[in-house]
Amino acid sequence: MSANENNLIWIDLEMTGLDPERDRIIEIATLVTDANLNILAEGPTIAVHQSDEQLALMDDWNVRTHTASGLVERVKASTMGDREAELATLEFLKQWVPAGKSPICGNSIGQDRRFLFKYMPELEVYFHYRYLDVSTLKELARRWKPEILDGFTKQGTHQAMDDIRESVAELAYYREHFIKL
């Protein structure tokens, strides 16, 4: 294993909601692929401790989803806060990609980046300023070739590592069926 500036960092966060001014990160996971989307390594999947008061602010969808997945209980049991989760993630990433080289990769990744900026700023600046957002291709396919969308189905577990693996697989699907190389 050696840091390679062409490797891609994929990330997913689960949050208590969508507003970084009010809501918090409750799970973070990362993985690294090479430029051809082969998974090289999976980083730690970390439940980030939040107070009962913070968890009580979740809307019905988040309560239902994160309770069903077991995430709420893992968050309550976790001893890692934002900073500890950020440092553990950075420790993993530094082995695979130099700072400032990989765009932030994932699905609707701008939302995750807003939370990183607020709660994990050292991790946020580790990424290049560019985005590799799989949802962009999904939106283009919906408009230009909608039949392609039927060929890829996501499980939608809303568990961070599962979601990242699906994002990588979804981009590989679009590369094969939508992007002309």
Curated annotation (Swiss-Prot):
The active site is at 129. CDD domains: Orn. Transmembrane segments: none annotated. GO terms for biological process: DNA metabolic process. It holds the Pfam family RNase_T. It is found in: Cytoplasm. Its EC number is 3.1.15.-. 3'-to-5' exoribonuclease specific for small oligoribonucleotides. Belongs to the oligoribonuclease family. This is Oligoribonuclease. The lineage of its organism: Bacteria, Pseudomonadati, Pseudomonadota, Gammaproteobacteria, Enterobacterales. The gene is orn.
